[in-house]
């Protein structure tokens, strides 16, 4: 079972409101990847958030949720909250996905995980073109580094500090890494 955290604690400043709740094709954005992965038995999904409405959506849809005010301290707060809880439950590795990347498929994430495992590296990141992007995965050896992150620093800080320890995997379809940060991007994704 692949332990997967969906990071859903952001402030969505460029969007103007909580984009994770914006309905994309009839479903709140945060639920697209969460439900797609949860329905696939290869994954155990946990959403990390500080938003009451996201927590309520998770509860209504049977998705595990870590509610933490630490998310208000930036991306690192969400990562720390998730790592602490899953490490206590014995997770050997954690895969991180973004709540605003609704196009990621379970098959892509499973293929990334399989290739990462075969690499023997302690951490891995997908590539969209030449750019590292979510999802990213970290073995338990990386938990101390993840727990030491501060502010809006995410796993990319660790990946860039230790590239020799990182497995980089080109996404077969880089469109799956698209995130939605602005209302204009959101409107482009709506059916006509």
Tell where the protein language model's regions lie, with residue ranges.
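Conserved SAM-binding loop
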Residues: 22-23, 47, 67, 96, ...
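Short aromatic/basic micro-patch
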Residues: 23, 103, 137, 168, ...
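Conserved N-terminal catalytic core of the sugar/cofactor nucleotidyltransferase
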Residues: 31-93, 107
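Conserved alpha/beta core of the MobA/IspD/sugar-nucleotide pyrophosphorylase nucleotidyltransferase superfamily
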Residues: 1-4, 144, 148-192
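Conserved beta-loop-beta/alpha segment of the NTase-like Rossmann-fold superfamily
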Residues: 72-144
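Conserved beta-strand segments of alpha/beta enzyme cores
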Residues: 20, 44, 64, 122, ...
